[in-house]
Amino acid sequence: MEGKNQTNISEFLLLGFSSWQQQQVLLFALFLCLYLTGLFGNLLILLAIGSDHCLHTPMYFFLANLSLVDLCLPSATVPKMLLNIQTQTQTISYPGCLAQMYFCMMFANMDNFLLTVMAYDRYVAICHPLHYSTIMALRLCASLVAAPWVIAILNPLLHTLMMAHLHFCSDNVIHHFFCDINSLLPLSCSDTSLNQLSVLATVGLIFVVPSVCILVSYILIVSAVMKVPSAQGKLKAFSTCGSHLALVILFYGAITGVYMSPLSNHSTEKDSAASVIFMVVAPVLNPFIYSLRNNELKGTLKKTLSRPGAVAHACNPSTLGGRGGWIMRSGDRDHPG
């Protein structure tokens, strides 16, 4: 460690998918399509929820936050990757790398928390429908979103500050398409055991615990659905919850493969593929699985888009914050399955 030359590295090289030289145009088109699809889908959800006061209920409040996060998560990595492919450059500045690492961790953490909150919301709606409005009150809904935002902001800040105190040697090549913490740690000349321990602790507390909560929520949901006498009702509930659970398994499975295994067992190709799943693919699928399959939301979208000035109205802060706005009418509408 100490014998290596410690130099002040001003930039890193993101190799990304550079080994796929013959497929660079295809990769550019693929990631651009995925990014724009996710961007458009999540913006549509925000537009619909922001423009219709009838959708200012707990479920759609959580959906709006999820859509916002799913706009930001791929935006922290994909534009830079597309720029590097287009310009045939692979550099990213040292401050830019740390900033990218921070925002990726922050939005991934928040995505994880929101999936957990939405699983709980679904559990209350299905298992305690008569008490839904009482349980999912304004104060609880606000706390279920505010507390995760605080944790999601502060936790990656700790990792970023710890990373900023490490020394880096002449090796500045990152075998990834973004500045992932597990790709940066092996490049350091300093002792990174504390950093690795903090990563494992973070994954254990911020990802494993919520995933267990989600699993328990869905077990209770399945148990409640099995008591429904109508076969059609069971099929509808299982169809909806099954697609949600599949996405959750995809999200957590990818994160577990990247962050729960020791650094020595990491494979560049596997890490990149797994990261694409939870950084790019999941945010694209979320709008379709959680929202665009919802007839109520699709109906609102059609009415909103056909109305002049709909976008300006939806983006007006007063639309979301007036009296009787967010979450205040949680009992006015049935919770969509």
UniProtKB/Swiss-Prot annotation:
Where mainly found? membrane
Q: Which residues lie on this side of the membrane: Cytoplasmic?
A: 50-57, 121-139, 220-236, 293-337
The glycosylation sites are N5, N8, N265
**Any one Gene Ontology biological process term?**
signal transduction
Q: Where in the cell is it found?
A: Cell membrane
Q: Which family does it belong to?
A: Belongs to the G-protein coupled receptor 1 family.
One Pfam family cited in the UniProt record for this chain: 7tm_4
State the organism named in the record.
Answer: Homo sapiens (Human)
* Function text: Odorant receptor.
The GO cellular component terms are: plasma membrane
Intervals, Extracellular compartment? 1-25, 80-100, 159-196, 260-272
Keywords per UniProt = Cell membrane, Disulfide bond, G-protein coupled receptor, Glycoprotein, Membrane, Olfaction, Receptor, Sensory transduction, Transducer, Transmembrane, Transmembrane helix
The molecular function GO annotations come to: G protein-coupled receptor activity; olfactory receptor activity
Gene name, Swiss-Prot/TrEMBL: OR1F12P
- Gene3D superfamilies this protein is in? Rhodopsin 7-helix transmembrane proteins
Report how it sits in the membrane.
Answer: Multi-pass membrane protein
Q: What is this protein called?
A: Putative olfactory receptor 1F12P
Q: Which cysteines are joined by disulfide bonds?
A: C97-C189
- List all membrane-crossing ranges: 26-49, 58-79, 101-120, 140-158, 197-219, 237-259, 273-292
